[in-house]
Amino acid sequence: MHTMEVKEYRVGIADLNVAKSPDRIITVGLGSCIGIALYDRINGVGGLLHIMLPDSTQFKNVSNPLKFPDLGIIIMTDKMKEKGANIRNIKAKISGGASMFNFSDKSMVMDIGRRNIEAVRKKLKELSIPIVAEEVGGNKGRTMTLDTSNGIVQIKTVGVGMKEI
């Protein structure tokens, strides 16, 4: 029996990748950033986006739309559709949004992690994409891996270990 070789695609900060089963997509260094894994189980298409900031409308010139959930999620769903995904089948799993800096005055940093979480939830809701699992908040960095053969997302949290969502 011929086993298919599994490729692993990396996603940097303000970056995305889309793949078909059985490939895997991984992003490291999720602090206040959010990793958004979208998966169409029926068509075996997955995508992973690593956003940094909550809202592109706060910026005059957007050099990289993948920094933001309001733009990046749309770009990712379009790329998934090109690979055969149907938007109606897509489910989301999200991770990240940590508060990486312990300032005594939380409002001083405008808690970017929390704002990122809210912005991602809002955009997914607008697109009628349900969030089926999440691992967000806290104050530790995470690595996120999407397995496009089954939609399982592995979260590795610094100093905590591995978890599947």
UniProtKB/Swiss-Prot annotation:
Record-linked Pfam families: CheD
Top-level division of the source organism's lineage: Bacteria
Entry keyword Protein biosynthesis: no
Purpose: Probably deamidates glutamine residues to glutamate on methyl-accepting chemotaxis receptors (MCPs), playing an important role in chemotaxis.
Name this protein carries in UniProt: Probable chemoreceptor glutamine deamidase CheD
InterPro entries: CheD-like_sf, Chemorcpt_Glu_NH3ase_CheD, Cytotoxic_necrot_fac-like_cat
HAMAP family cross-referenced by the UniProt entry: CheD
GO BP term, example: chemotaxis
Family in the record: Belongs to the CheD family.
Catalytic activity line of the entry: L-glutaminyl-[protein] + H2O = L-glutamyl-[protein] + NH4(+)
EC number: 3.5.1.44
Keywords: Chemotaxis, Hydrolase
Single GO molecular function: protein-glutamine glutaminase activity
Native organism: Clostridium tetani (strain Massachusetts / E88)
Gene responsible for this protein: cheD
